[in-house]
A protein has these predicted regions:
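Non-catalytic signal-transmission and effector/linker regions of two-component phosphorelay proteins
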Residues: 2-65, 69-72, 80, 163-191
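Structural beta-sheet core signal
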Residues: 48, 129-131
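Active-site residues of response regulator receiver
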Residues: 50, 96-106
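Conserved beta-strand scaffold positions in the cores of enzyme catalytic domains, especially
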Residues: 73-75, 155-156
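Acidic, metal-coordinating helix/loop segments flanking the phosphotransfer/catalytic sites
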Residues: 75-93, 100-102
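Conserved phosphotransfer cores of two-component systems
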Residues: 87-89, 119-127, 151
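Glycine/Thr-rich phosphate-binding loops of Rossmann-like dinucleotide-binding domains
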Residues: 103-104, 139, 166
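Alpha4 helix (beta4-alpha4-beta5 surface) of REC/receiver domains from two-component response regulators
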Residues: 107-111, 115, 134-157, 161
Length: 191
């Protein structure tokens, strides 16, 4: 049996992770031993936006857990990076951090997370989105949740703080995949 592997894709060079393909496995690169081009994706293309608020983030661990399943994680640290991913790659599920800056030059001035949600909602086929709250006041949390749900968010979750929070994120992604893609991988056979 052949196995297909993919790699985590990042639009930030200093966050790029390259994983060597397994020996004897089909890498999806036409038998040349090279990984498939990232724009082709795998069974599922996952946009991971992350505002960089934790030293050992779940966003580093999640792609390693999903990669053996054929999930390609596209990581973005700003709204501009997320926009570049969306315009170049079909996204099947998006994780949107509401604290995401628009760009590196103004991390505090404008937050790109809400704008990214609006951009995703305007897509011809909007992907289901999982929204990560900014952890502000209760009133602001309520406002963020309502705005996210109005824009079609599948789920709104608290900021993951520890590795145990990965289980919640994995369960939310599993439910999202089951509900929106009816038990089928968007880019391949059923799961």
């Amino acid at each position: 049996a052949l196995c297909r592997t993919t790699r985590m894709v990042s639009v930030r060079p200093h966050h790029r992770h390259h994983h060597a393909p397994p020996l004897g496995g089909d890498t999806g690169g036409g038998g040349s031993g090279n990984p498939a081009p990232s724009h082709l994706g795998g069974r599922l293309n996952l946009l991971l936006s992350y505002a960089g608020w934790h030293a050992d983030p779940w966003v580093d661990h999640l792609p390693r857990l999903l990669e053996p399943l054929g999930v390609v994680s596209h990581r973005a640290g700003t709204g501009r990076e997320a926009n570049a991913v969306i315009t170049s790659t079909p996204i099947h599920i998006a994780v949107v951090d509401l604290g995401l800056p628009i760009d590196d030059s103004s991390p505090q001035a404008e937050e790109g997370g809400p704008r990214l949600l609006e951009l995703l909602a305007r897509q011809a086929s909007p992907p289901p989105t999982v929204v990560i709250k900014r952890s502000r006041s209760h009133r602001d949390d309520i406002r963020d949740i309502n705005a996210a749900l109005r824009l079609g968010a599948f789920a709104v979750v608290d900021r993951p703080r520890k590795i145990d929070d990965l289980n919640l994120m994995l369960e939310v992604l599993r439910r999202c995949l089951a509900r929106h893609y009816h038990g089928m991988w968007p880019g391949g056979p059923s799961f």
